[in-house]
UniProtKB/Swiss-Prot annotation:
Protein name, per record: Malate dehydrogenase
Chain residues that bind NAD(+): G10, A11, G12, Q13, I14, G15, D34, N96, I119, T120, N121
EC number: 1.1.1.37
Keywords: NAD, Oxidoreductase, Tricarboxylic acid cycle
InterPro entries linked to this entry: L-lactate/malate_DH, Lactate/malate_DH_C, Lactate/malate_DH_N, Lactate_DH/Glyco_Ohase_4_C, Malate_DH_type3, NAD(P)-bd_dom_sf
Cited HAMAP family: Malate_dehydrog_3
Catalysed reaction, written as an equation: (S)-malate + NAD(+) = oxaloacetate + NADH + H(+)
């Protein structure tokens, strides 16, 4: 039985990290694609040469032609321009929309049956555009957002409570940007909701509010520290978690930027919501109930995403 084929579109920091993680976890053979000649080939060769020490047999290949991604089971898209200090994710829309058009056409022509995970920012608008350009079924095109944002939230909570990250669950919904909605009420430590932990004296509401805001600013904090790029380790591990759920039919409940039509009162748009990922792609949207405050924050985030989608339509008339 042939191993699954994983195509990584973009051989930058995230793409290279994705390739390494996919190999270590033996998720399948990897094609690392980039328009820059030599870059994907060099990284693929470097990672392949770590195989004897790390004990994996996955085949690594670098490519500059979309023909090399033919028949891919999973495509993870990182291609585009990363943020720099002072930039918001939304500042990237014009440049990266053109990239999504090229990528979408490449996937449509050579890997139309793939499960596609988009990482390129501004995430919610780019995954929508990628689905439009590729023509793939909406349940097979998803954005990596909530898994990363929730991981950041979980990390900050584990540090605050001095407990293992394995015992912290957290949900972040909405757009992957400044209006994201970390759901305190649905987040727990070993099953104990965060509001109860405040009442128990484990932390204060003020500290919890600070953690929520730091989660929203999580990407910008790293951009400010690196100065020359954006995060890549955590985004890559988040996307690999999603890819593994699909390839192994794990039925994982993961927050992702998915196409929502009916749930949460939304009609046909991409935004971060709880999903079930299995062999069918996005197999279910988990329509959790929000209180008035949560709904107001979610609505604000949805409106921000709608604004980005309208901006995309203004830039490329084929999307209108």
């Amino acid at each position: 039985m042939a191993r699954p084929k994983i195509a990584l579109i973009g051989a930058g920091q995230i793409g290279g990290t994705l390739a390494h993680l996919a190999a270590i976890k033996e998720l399948g053979d990897v094609v690392l694609f980039d328009i820059a000649e030599g870059t994907p080939q060099g990284k693929a060769l470097d990672i392949a040469q770590s195989g004897p020490s790390e004990g994996f047999d996955a085949v690594m290949k670098g490519a500059n032609s979309y023909e090399e991604i033919a028949g891919a089971d999973v495509c993870i898209v990182t291609a585009g321009v990363p943020r720099k200090p002072g930039m918001s994710r939304d500042d990237l829309i014009g440049i990266n929309l053109k990239v999504m058009k090229s990528v979408g056409e490449g996937i449509k022509a050579h890997a139309p049956n793939a499960f596609v995970i988009c990482i390129t920012n501004p995430l919610d608008a780019m995954v929508w555009a990628l689905q439009q350009f590729s023509g793939l079924p909406a349940e097979k095109v998803v954005g990596m957002a909530g898994v990363l944002d929730s991981a950041r939230f979980r990390h900050f909570l584990s540090v605050e409570f001095n407990v293992s990250m394995r015992d912290v669950t957290a949900f972040v919904l909405g757009g992957h940007g400044d209006t994201m909605v970390p759901l305190v009420r649905y987040s727990t430590v070993a099953g104990i909701p965060l509001p109860d932990l405040v009442q128990m004296g484990w932390t204060t509401q003020e500290k919890l509010d600070q953690i929520v805001q730091r989660t929203r600013d999580g990407g910008a904090e790293i951009v400010g520290l690196l100065k020359t790029g954006s995060a890549f380790y955590a985004p890559a591990t988040s996307a690999i978690e999603m890819a593994e759920a699909y390839l192994k039919d794990q039925k994982r409940l993961l927050p992702c930027a998915a196409y929502v039509d009916g749930a949460f009162g939304l009609n046909g748009m991409y935004v971060g919501v709880p999903t079930i990922i299995g062999a069918g792609g996005i197999e279910k949207i988990v329509d959790i109930k929000l209180n008035d405050d949560e709904q107001a924050m979610f609505d604000k985030s949805v409106n921000a995403v709608k604004g980005l989608v309208e901006a995309c339509k203004g830039i490329d008339s084929s999307l209108a």
